[in-house]
């Protein structure tokens, strides 16, 4: 078959606008270019009839109708704007017009000074210096709404309102004067002590002796308990030191030698101080007073002091073996050192036991507490002469 040629579609029709002058062509050139673009777009979207000639198309021949192009509102606005192309929206921006500086001469300054002197109003004009931008600062009053509106200058400081944050994070209003201790700002008065004595059950003059008396009684009770435990432990240790073999005794006693020695030192010191309180001798004159010495012997104060002093020295002499067992565990102590330790240990047990027996026979031989009580009664006579009030004061002081 001879080759067949496809029909060439006709070129798009163009609307040629004739103008009499070249200036009109330049104005409408842009408009015609836009119309040509729109017309080409429409023609390309139209589907024309296919020729009956034989061709190698895949799809069969179908007649189709041409579909017109639907214009949108935006395109219509463009066409209307193209028709009125002579009207344009122009934006005009005016720059800042520089103002020439005024040149002042000496004559102008003199004239202004003359007018200011002749001004009949007499009002003084406030002259403000220009702020230096490098030093000027802006301070924002952030807490303006947070402050109390009644916080005036003439209001007393104690009546001002402050805001205190609570444990839940919220603030509550409180007066500033609540946190002031007004007693510090009051002038001292002579009648303050008398008023305090009248308000208190125990007079101020008797508070210190009463506290000393109660402290002495508590210490005496604690010392009695410690002396009882010390006597039992020291006797038990003395029995073990003679009944056990040296190797077994030293092996078991090695790890607790220093703690036991420290405990014995504390207990014997407490017992010795308690024995000094029983003697009633606190001044140099008491050693030459026959009455004091007789009372000390009668209360077992002097004998108790000697016993506890010997026990404290015996405890100090035991440190030689106990320190060697603690700091030199590989070194075997000599037999003489072990024998001396046993002797001192027995002496320590005897003194602690004898001191506890002397205390058991006379548990109320606390001379210090008795003298404090007598001093309180003497001061009580100076405070008041009312027997009922004396009884109330003594009951409150727990004497």
From Swiss-Prot:
Q: Which InterPro entries match?
A: TMEM237
Instruction: For the region Disordered, give the residue spans.
Output: 1-158
Provide the Gene Ontology terms for cellular component. Answer: ciliary basal body; ciliary transition zone; membrane
First and last residue of the signal peptide: none
Annotated membrane-spanning segments are: 222-242, 256-276, 301-321, 343-363
- The lineage's top-level taxon is Eukaryota
Q: Which GO terms describe its biological process?
A: cilium assembly; non-motile cilium assembly
Q: How does it sit in the membrane?
A: Multi-pass membrane protein
Biased composition of type Pro residues is found at: 1-11
Chief location bin: membrane
Q: Name one Pfam family in it.
A: TMEM237
Subcellular location(s) per record: Membrane; Cell projection, Cilium
Alphabetically sorted, this entry's keywords are: Cell projection, Cilium, Cilium biogenesis/degradation, Membrane, Transmembrane, Transmembrane helix
Positions with biased composition (Basic and acidic residues): 36-45, 111-135, 144-158
Instruction: Give the protein's function.
Output: Component of the transition zone in primary cilia. Required for ciliogenesis.
Q: Which family does it belong to?
A: Belongs to the TMEM237 family.
Q: What is this protein called?
A: Transmembrane protein 237 homolog
Q: Which organism is it from?
A: Caenorhabditis elegans
Gene it is expressed from: jbts-14
